[in-house]
Amino acid sequence: MEFGLHLPASSSSVASEDLIRFSRQAEALGFYCITVADHVIVPRNISVPYPYTVDGKYPGTGYHLETLTTMSFLAGATQRIRFLTSVMIAPYRNPVITAKMLASLDVLSQGRVIVGLGVGWMKEEFENLKAPAYQERGRVTDEYIKAFRELWTSEKPSFNGKYCTFSNIIFLPKPVQKPAIPIWIGGHSKQALRRAGELGDGWHPIGGVPTIPLEPDDVRKDLRMLEEYAHAAGRDPREIRVALKGSLFDREKQISPGQRRRFMGSAEEITSDIRDYREAGVDTMIFDVRRASFTETLERMEWMAKEVIAKI
């Protein structure tokens, strides 16, 4: 089983030197990957409820370093750890330029890129970026995935879709990873499972939050559906990775009897949770270890590695 960490980059109080230190410590402790979130802008008025909070309000401040720029910066400061977009909103960017940036980063990092892709949820962000229509974001994402793979694998790339078209071009360099950069599909909806089964190299949902607990039994149920989609597409579902992003845990938080959430509590409790998800079919766990101060965040990362992961 592999383990990853979410990059604590959503605050102006975290300096570039802090992010380098975080990444290097994660690498030294043996973590598999670091995830980087994706928002280009945050509208002041948001009409669509945020799916991961009880009140539907987006909890962010609007501070977001650009995803691929951040990954490039940190890849240059590390040697082995992988970097995962978690998740990049596929319709926000021109697919050919995005494929080029990802391929270039894969070459420069010597094959350490994973692309987590989602369809997005913030309608006003689509509108302000002049992205394809919000209502068509699922179809756009499907098409962009196919376009990415065509550009990354074909010697003479050609694509004729509704949202993306190119032909008679040279696209070099190709990614270091073969046959292509892995694409993990974010989300937990039926369409996300269909997309992962048909097109993804991995399924990358969020779990352990009040609105979407995604208990191990839920994972088993969803994986059965994903497997059906994979078989229908002529694919082997065993080749599709399952990478769950867990909620922020807190080893000091007092949980009332019967009220405990997954990944919260003692090292023993969190270790037990991870084993439950491993048995359900999860092979990669990603955690957010942010605390009030950056020093505490680094301490929490080390605690996670030595007191939890070491016991798995």
Walk through the language-model features, giving the residues of each.
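Active-site-adjacent structural elements that line small-molecule/cofactor binding pockets in enzymes
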Residues: M1-I312
